Structures are given as structure tokens and as C-alpha cells.
Amino acid sequence: MEKKKKEEKKEGKILEKVKIGYQDVVIERETSTFSKQTDSYGEYDHRKNIISIQTELSDLDEANTLLHEILHGIAYINSLTVGGMPLDKEEKEEIVINQITNGLMQVFRDNKWLLDFLKEKTK
């Protein structure tokens, strides 16, 4: 089991695709390049339609990072980041996306039944 988990976290391995709006976004692994604590765990590249996630993350950080980057994709594809819109400044976007991600992750962790319920209701 442990070996399988390590294999899943290899650099360059495409985990899956996620549909965000009209785009199919590839989710891939990338070797950690952290040089300071403020470096990010992941990145959404709207030009390439790729979400990159660092390989050295715990399962919880990996889930949080993926949700965080998906929310960046939703904000971008729905034009919330263009001039005059609520998230038109990078600082505003990051604060809002981070707070919503962390809030949702806490709700999901505290209410284990919720994701299954939502999945069942959206068939």
C-alpha cells in the first residue's frame, strides 16, 4: 500500500482531468521547489489548462491544494479575475480563494457524510 501511494506522487504523473467550466484541466505532479515558506503547493495555469501539485504533500495538504487550485480555475473561467470584478487583484483573489478552500475543507472533514450526500444528489 505504501509503495502504491509513493508511485501516485511521482513527478509528471497525470492524476486525472477535471472539467472546470468549458475547459478540461489536467492535474499533474511537480517536484517541490520550495526555497521559502511562502512558496505555493500548487498552481493553476489557465494558458496550459494544467493544475500542478507538488509531490511532497501530505494527503490532507494535497486535497486542500487541489480544491484551492480548482477554485482558482472557477474564478478565472467565470471572469471573476478581470478588471472591475471582485477578484481583479491577485492579492484579493488569493485571500478569498484560500479562505473559501480552508472553510470547505473544514466542513468536509467535520461532516464525513457530506461529500457522499452531494455526490448522490448530483447524479
Residue ranges of each PLM-predicted region?
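Active-site recognition of the HExxH zinc-binding catalytic motif
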Residues: 64-76
